[in-house]
């Protein structure tokens, strides 16, 4: 693989980030909007940063950070539904995608060859 842009998990997490930003456009709570969009942006950003470090151990570390951000994002999506800041159907779709991305990240971590 020549570039992080070729990773399916990066592509999907980037699309999810865009979806989260769109879902939060009308959000009246600026603090919530800022926190959830930061979590969403953290996923593809950490995948890219880890890949560009050119070190297996660094890549794994950043993939784990991205995986943690998936959990943070899912939590914020659930809370956004419950407090009425996010449309349930849109947020549920994002929750499902974040869970799949988390699984993909773990699979990638498990498949990376040793140094």
PLM feature spans:
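Amphipathic alpha-helical assembly/interaction segments
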Residues: 1-115
């Amino acid at each position: 693989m020549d570039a992080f842009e070729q990773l399916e998990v990066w592509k999907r997490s980037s699309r999810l980030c865009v979806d989260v930003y769109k879902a939060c456009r009308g959000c009246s709570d600026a603090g919530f909007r800022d926190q959830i969009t930061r979590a969403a942006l953290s996923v593809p950003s950490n995948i890219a940063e880890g890949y560009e470090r050119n070190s297996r151990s660094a890549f794994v570390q950043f993939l784990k950070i991205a995986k943690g951000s998936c959990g943070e994002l899912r939590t914020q999506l659930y809370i956004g539904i419950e407090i009425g800041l996010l449309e349930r159907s849109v947020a549920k779709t994002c929750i499902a995608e974040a869970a799949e991305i988390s699984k993909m990240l773990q699979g990638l971590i498990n498949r990376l060859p040793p140094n």
